[in-house]
């Protein structure tokens, strides 16, 4: 076993897929070591939600970093969205996913379950851009600085 007592996750991302985020959330939740999340540059969309999964007290954000929170969107792979039952089902599913991930983010930041969902809704569902100070005010970031990390590495490979 490693002597490492915390796992750093460095984030500089325009965001990504909600289902990939779900996989990362499960990995973090099942990890026996605490996770420190560190935003360098930007964390947008799914990356912003991932940032909130750092252990309380271990969420770092660079002074000039930015965070952007937005509702989950969907695409059927073309510029045209098909009307009818498919769209209704997909829209309902997206709303359930939005409430779920924003509920998790709210819990991670010590807020009521609907805190971030309500914030986005109050902004007419527009993208919400925050600087590091604003992230600290909402308890998304715990520190407005990048942590000093010392890395010692050893690799042992054996073939039998």
Model-derived regions, located:
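N-terminal organellar transit peptides
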Residues: 1-46, 53-160
């Amino acid at each position: 076993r490693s002597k490492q007592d915390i796992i750093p996750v460095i984030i500089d991302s325009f965001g990504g897929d909600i289902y990939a985020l779900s996989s990362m959330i499960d990995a973090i939740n099942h990890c026996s070591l605490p996770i420190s999340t560190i935003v360098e540059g930007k964390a947008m969309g799914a990356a912003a939600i991932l940032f909130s999964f750092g252990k309380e007290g271990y969420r770092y954000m660079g002074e000039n970093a930015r965070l952007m929170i937005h509702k989950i969107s969907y695409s059927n792979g073309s510029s045209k969205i098909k009307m009818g039952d498919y769209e209704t089902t997909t829209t309902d599913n997206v709303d359930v996913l939005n409430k779920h991930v924003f509920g998790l983010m709210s819990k991670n930041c010590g807020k009521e379950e609907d805190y971030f969902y309500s914030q986005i809704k109050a902004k007419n569902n527009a993208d919400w851009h925050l600087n590091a100070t604003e992230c600290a005010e909402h308890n998304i970031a715990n520190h407005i600085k990048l942590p000093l990390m010392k890395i010692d590495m050893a690799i042992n490979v054996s073939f039998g």
